């Protein structure tokens, strides 16, 4: 029998130290990685619950194991809340990640060797959108489109020309580093013109879409996939949505289970249910509006210091800083800002002369700092600090001074107060 008093701290000092240090890092660093956020204590509670003990292969009401009556409640809650949030007719909350969701969707819609089209990883796409190192570029014939080198915007005419030339069976509209509004209807028209399915990957956009402040593709695309963290502020996991189509729904379910997964992680499914309920609150819409305002304020402030912002700005939660003209690499910028307790990620920019391990840009996102409570005043101050470091990237005195300012700001806006 287990005692409820069993704790990591008194048993595993090495792991406890790592956990404590990570908690301190999150409190004392400003998180600007666009794909990261902080979940609520409620989400943490669900993810650490006894549901982790339960195996539940199958779907609610159709399990291969007994004793699933209560985990069925949790999964049904997550499904129904996801459908309401995203105005979907179908939802599968079992994928372990966004990549798993994309894998299931691709396998449901395509046969090996079929052609798919997606945005190049180097231009802001994702590994699962046809990158050669990923299943999507190995099992399928992947054709990649890019953004306009001058504007940083999707060239829909080029997408249409490529679609007509290659006749893909699936077009993926999804992004990890694209800052502007996506024209879902234009993608739909291009897909219809060549008889292709349309998959919308909203992993980065889900929170804004759920809040109703970014265009929703669910009733436009054949299938929509997402993560449940990032802007949605839930556990690190995946989600598949779709408009009504019984044939596709059946294929999606079978490709998730038993196609690519066994038992779902029921504690994570429960955490999704909590996060989806939180996303239904009026405060969540206010949060998402502030996410966009903060990203726009920061992009404008950095641009005013002479740095190039890809596409000239942002309509969402993220933007790319192109460092080519400054003679800096993303790797060096990432490291210098990290020493100042500002966490970003190096990122390729369109037509990047550097390798993906070095890059010529950094990606900046506002979800996590907005969760802390930052608004425009703090954002403009922070943008100045970022530029101070980048302007004199080898000056450790500037970096140390910036770190002290960051620590003071973090103390004013704790993650978990």
From Swiss-Prot:
Catalytic activity: (6R)-5,10-methylene-5,6,7,8-tetrahydrofolate + glycine + H2O = (6S)-5,6,7,8-tetrahydrofolate + L-serine
Quaternary context: Homodimer.
Annotated site location: Plays an important role in substrate specificity: 229
Methyltransferase in keyword set: no
S-adenosyl-L-methionine in keyword set: no
Gene: glyA
Cell compartments where the protein resides: Cytoplasm
Disulfide pattern: none
Gene Ontology MF terms in the entry: glycine hydroxymethyltransferase activity; pyridoxal phosphate binding
PANTHER family per record: SERINE HYDROXYMETHYLTRANSFERASE (PTHR11680:SF50)
InterPro entries in alphabetical order: PyrdxlP-dep_Trfase (IPR015424), PyrdxlP-dep_Trfase_major (IPR015421), PyrdxlP-dep_Trfase_small (IPR015422), Ser_HO-MeTrfase (IPR001085), Ser_HO-MeTrfase-like (IPR049943), Ser_HO-MeTrfase_PLP_BS (IPR019798), SHMT-like_dom (IPR039429)
Sites bearing N6-(pyridoxal phosphate)lysine, chain numbering: 230
Biological process per Gene Ontology, one example term: glycine biosynthetic process from serine
Organism from which the protein derives: Nitrosococcus oceani (strain ATCC 19707 / BCRC 17464 / JCM 30415 / NCIMB 11848 / C-107)
Cofactor section: pyridoxal 5'-phosphate
Protein name: Serine hydroxymethyltransferase
Lineage, top ranks: Bacteria, Pseudomonadati, Pseudomonadota, Gammaproteobacteria, Chromatiales
